[in-house]
């Protein structure tokens, strides 16, 4: 009942005094994919290209306006194209003038914008995928519609979302770490 418990006294190791012995760490600003880096620019270009091609493929069909989900996909990809293109220009500017884009307000704006566009793009891609499956598998009226174009545009919208997700997560993580 009154058993003794051992006392635990952790012993701290002395910090290294020689700067050469200190472990090197990765600074948050060195992460690829952050705003103002070449990786961030690559992600923005990929987002823009995938969303732009999805928009072009969907808009090339004549019967997309008859389905609300496809109209939503077109609207979401337009917004995704505008957002990604504008941030790609900001990234190019930051790379050219070697400027840091890690201002708290800028990172907060990037994270909020990426979150909104990610939610819209993912919702549009999911709704378009549902309608495409309905048309192709359930109703079997793919011969009358442009199912190949619908599937391609939906897949490209998902790819745009996959390219957007790392940007959002890195910006959100950077914002939360401050």
Curated annotation (Swiss-Prot):
Taxon lineage: Eukaryota, Viridiplantae, Streptophyta, Embryophyta, Tracheophyta
The family this protein is said to belong to: Belongs to the Casparian strip membrane proteins (CASP) family.
Keywords: Cell membrane, Membrane, Transmembrane, Transmembrane helix
Protein name: CASP-like protein 5A1
Subcellular location: Cell membrane
Bilayer-spanning residue ranges: 38-58, 70-90, 106-126, 153-173
Region (Disordered): 1-24
Segments on the Cytoplasmic face: 1-37, 91-105, 174-178
Keyword hit for Iron: no
Membrane-side (Extracellular) residue stretches: 59-69, 127-152
InterPro entries, per database record: CASP_dom (IPR006702), CASPL-5 (IPR045009)
Any single GO CC term annotated in Swiss-Prot or TrEMBL for this entry: membrane
Pfam families: CASP_dom
Membrane topology: Multi-pass membrane protein
Subunit structure: Homodimer and heterodimers.
Taxonomic source organism: Brachypodium distachyon
């Amino acid at each position: 009942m009154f058993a003794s418990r051992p006392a635990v006294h952790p012993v701290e190791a002395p910090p290294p005094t020689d700067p050469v012995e200190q472990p090197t760490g990765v600074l948050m600003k060195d992460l690829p994919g952050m705003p103002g880096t070449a990786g961030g620019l690559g992600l923005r270009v990929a987002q823009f290209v995938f969303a732009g091609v999805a928009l072009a493929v969907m808009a090339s069909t004549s019967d997309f306006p008859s389905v609300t989900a496809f109209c939503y996909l077109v609207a979401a990809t337009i917004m995704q194209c505008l957002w990604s293109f504008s941030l790609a220009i900001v990234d190019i500017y930051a790379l050219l003038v070697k400027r840091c884009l890690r201002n708290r307000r800028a990172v907060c704006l990037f994270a909020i914008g990426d979150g909104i566009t990610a939610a819209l793009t993912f919702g549009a891609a999911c709704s378009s995928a549902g309608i495409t499956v309905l048309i192709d598998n359930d109703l079997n009226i793919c011969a009358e519609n442009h199912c190949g174009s619908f599937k391609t545009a939906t897949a490209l919208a998902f790819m745009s979302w996959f390219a957007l997700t790392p940007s959002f997560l890195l910006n959100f993580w950077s914002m939360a770490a401050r």
